[in-house]
Amino acid sequence: MDFKDKKPVVAICYDFDKTLSPDDMQAQGFIQSVGYDVEAFWNESNELAKVADMDQTLAWMFEMRARSAGKTLFTRSQLMDYGSKVRLFDGVEDWFDRIKGYGEEAGVIVEHYIISSGLKEMIEGTALKDKFKRIYASSFLFDENGVAIWPAQVINYTNKTQFLFRIEKGVLDVNDQRVNDHFTQDQLRVPFRNIVYIGDSFTDIPCMKLVNSYGGYSIGVYNSETCDKSKVYKMMRDDRIKYFAPADYRENKELDLLVKNIIERTAKNEQLERKYYNCQKEVIESDSMKAVYEKQKTDLILALEDSDSFNQTHKIVEKMRNISNWTKEEREEIVQIALKNSQVFYILKDYDIRTFLNRITEGLSSENVSRLKEKI
């Protein structure tokens, strides 16, 4: 990021099922509509994945399409309609604007992202669809009639991590290959230290671990109605998360206060990062200028050595006179050139040459220096 021009960005990334909603989205209307028991549907889906050596996400996407045949429309609009019926945890609907507004007051840009193996079309059917900068979720390809015909995007717990790198680098399009390019620290749009990942289960572990290991914030949430903390306890023991809290998104509740503290900390920390960046930049620029300066001296010495006319020698010495910090080794080399190159040697008594060489030989003591002083 360019610290001179931009506010720091905090990216808050969410799983969906059991993180923002108390249950799997498919289990809140769709599975029942195709005449299946929820547990039976998932058992069959998992068995298909096992028998066919199939990705579990692809398995349930296949089952959804297959089981809907002759029972319900399997279209984009129908899936969005199922999504509109998905229940959300308390406080979720006003959470995103509230947290974004809090960030603005703290001088931080807050962005919300979904990274879920759930179904994008259902998420887009909820009241939350416009709250996210990007929704990264599994999705279908639809024909001209809006009927799902093939998986378009499949997201599982391992490939979720690529989207964190996309967010970090600001390369958000899923087909943008620049995500594989090298970015320097100052080019990163959202450094991992400013990424928050909120999830509920072991399928979130790769993302949580990645965020944690790079200095970000991983938060495990649990259903406040059941108060079952077994998963978050295990994730905490295994160093997968930094914090855990009930999935209660209402204002002034534990999760709300925790995320606000992270935003405040980010605002302060980025001031220090800005100072560090500017100090580092100054040193790099200084080193670069020094390197250019040293190269200039080397080039002038070589030019003097290769000078093939009196006129050229005068021009080179004019440039050399503007440099004050010749090293002892460089000065001795200049003395040697003055004695060896006839285009320098025969004009030693010229005023500009003489005054320059008098300055160069000051404090030096050697046979070459003595010979040169005799000539000038």
Label each region the model flagged.
Residues 1-144, 235:
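Alpha-helical substrate-recognition element adjacent to the catalytic core
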Residues 90-113, 117-333, 346-351, 358-376:
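C-terminal cap/substrate-recognition subdomain and adjoining C-terminal extension
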Residues 338-344:
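Amphipathic alpha-helical segments within extended alpha-helical solenoids and repeat-rich scaffolds
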